[in-house]
């Protein structure tokens, strides 16, 4: 096994200019991630300099068997924390051979919104809090829970330490460091309210880069849990009952919100979000109705409510933002399995482009 580990960690840059590029894309479910690798003649830092590639879309639920070729367009480059050296991870989106985005390509429409001059001028910042649950591989039950049983009630686990309260920290810390190495603007991690559940935060990142970074951070997490023999779940309510669900709270601000008088701009933006509540909920993740119950630090899915420091609201404004009269707000509605391309671009569209 030591020889295998040595070969896995072999630094090919010692005797070759060639690099390995891992092309990554979102699969047919809209949540599964797929990837495959190719050799390139030398280091690349600009995604536009990377070749397009293709894959069998009939094997990912993204194309019929009789016309199965789907084309990958490289969009963002990150350093590869697994192969290291000059090797890279490449976030791609997917198109038909005719150049049309396939239905599961949510990046294309998001990029159009973020390319709008009115959106560019406002330099939208996002900070996304990605929650997830670690599961024991063969029993599909949270890490640290007795098989077929339950731990003690919630309370001791949030931001906890100790072998009886904190489960999976080695995975979490490995993911944290690997994400930093990759160039993701990961800003922190913490243990969550339900045992076996964790969170990492990405941002503040500008525009579509926030969504690219979340997808690559998810990819890195899936790869690390694969190595550890643990399953990661982004289900918004993995365990029914008196247990917290998993969300992807999305913090948002624009240039106008960050400047003097920004609090008034924030309130107008929140008013717009309230008017489109149903549209946003329908795009904020599968199974979110199991999570947004009005309990466990959530608002009811059918009710739009905002407030200062209120974690039972749809939109929360921080005390600092209220006090300073400028800043950001937090959309607490997105589920942990949301598509960040959809959520970030929809918030920008509603607050900056949509006129009631």
Curated annotation (Swiss-Prot):
Keywords of the record: Acetylation, ATP-binding, Cytoplasm, Ligase, Nitrogen fixation, Nucleotide-binding, Phosphoprotein
Domain spans labelled GS beta-grasp: 19-99
Catalytic activity: L-glutamate + NH4(+) + ATP = L-glutamine + ADP + phosphate + H(+)
SUPFAM superfamilies named among the record's database cross-references: Glutamine synthetase, N-terminal domain, Glutamine synthetase/guanido kinase
EC number: 6.3.1.2
Localization annotation: Cytoplasm
Positions carrying Phosphoserine: 2, 48
Primary location recorded for the protein, binned into one broad class: cytoplasm
Residues with PTM N-acetylserine: 2
Keyword Transmembrane helix: no
Keyword Transport: no
GS catalytic domain residues: 106-356
Expression (tissue specificity): Expressed in the pericycle of all root tissues.
Induction: By ammonium supply under nitrogen-limited condition. Induced by sucrose, glucose, fructose, and during leaf senescence.
GO CC entries: cytoplasm
Biological process according to GO: glutamine biosynthetic process
Quaternary organization: Homooctamer. Interacts with GRF3.
Function in brief: Low-affinity glutamine synthetase. May contribute to the homeostatic control of glutamine synthesis in roots.
Family, per entry: Belongs to the glutamine synthetase family.
Name the UniProt record assigns to this protein: Glutamine synthetase cytosolic isozyme 1-2
Organism of origin: Arabidopsis thaliana (Mouse-ear cress)
Gene name tied to this protein: GLN1-2
């Amino acid at each position: 096994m030591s020889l295998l580990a040595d070969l896995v960690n072999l630094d090919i840059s010692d005797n070759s200019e060639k690099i390995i590029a891992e092309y990554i894309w979102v699969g047919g479910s809209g949540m599964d991630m797929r990837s495959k690798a190719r050799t390139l003649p030398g280091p690349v830092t600009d995604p536009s300099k990377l070749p397009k590639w293709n894959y069998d879309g009939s094997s990912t639920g993204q194309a019929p068997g009789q016309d199965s070729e789907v084309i990958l367009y490289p969009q963002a480059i990150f350093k590869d924390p697994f192969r290291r050296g000059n090797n890279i991870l490449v976030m791609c989106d997917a198109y038909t051979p005719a150049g049309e985005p396939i239905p599961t390509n949510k990046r294309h429409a998001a990029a159009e919104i973020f390319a709008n001059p009115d959106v560019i001028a406002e330099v939208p910042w996002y900070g996304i809090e990605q929650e997830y649950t670690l599961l024991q591989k063969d029993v599909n039950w949270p890490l640290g829970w007795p098989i077929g049983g339950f731990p003690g009630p919630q309370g001791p686990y949030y931001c906890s330490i100790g072998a009886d309260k904190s489960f999976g920290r080695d995975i979490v810390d490995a993911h944290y460091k690997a994400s930093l190495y990759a160039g993701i603007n990961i800003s922190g991690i913490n243990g969550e309210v339900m045992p076996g559940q964790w969170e990492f935060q990405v941002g503040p990142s500008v525009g579509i880069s926030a969504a690219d970074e979340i997808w690559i951070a998810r990819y890195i997490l899936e790869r690390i849990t694969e190595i550890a023999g643990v399953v990661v779940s982004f289900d918004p309510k993995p365990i029914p009952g008196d247990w917290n669900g998993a969300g992807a709270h999305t913090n948002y601000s624009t240039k106008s919100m960050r400047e003097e008088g920004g609090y008034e701009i924030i309130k107008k933006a929140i008013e717009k979000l309230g008017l489109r509540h149903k549209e946003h909920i329908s795009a904020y993740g599968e199974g979110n109705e199991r999570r947004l119950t009005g309990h466990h630090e959530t608002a009811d899915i059918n009710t739009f409510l905002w407030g200062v420091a209120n974690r039972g609201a749809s939109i929360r404004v921080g005390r600092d933002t209220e006090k300073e009269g400028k800043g950001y707000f937090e959309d607490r509605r997105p589920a942990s399995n949301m598509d960040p391309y959809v959520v970030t671009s929809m918030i920008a569209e509603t607050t900056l482009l949509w006129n009631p």
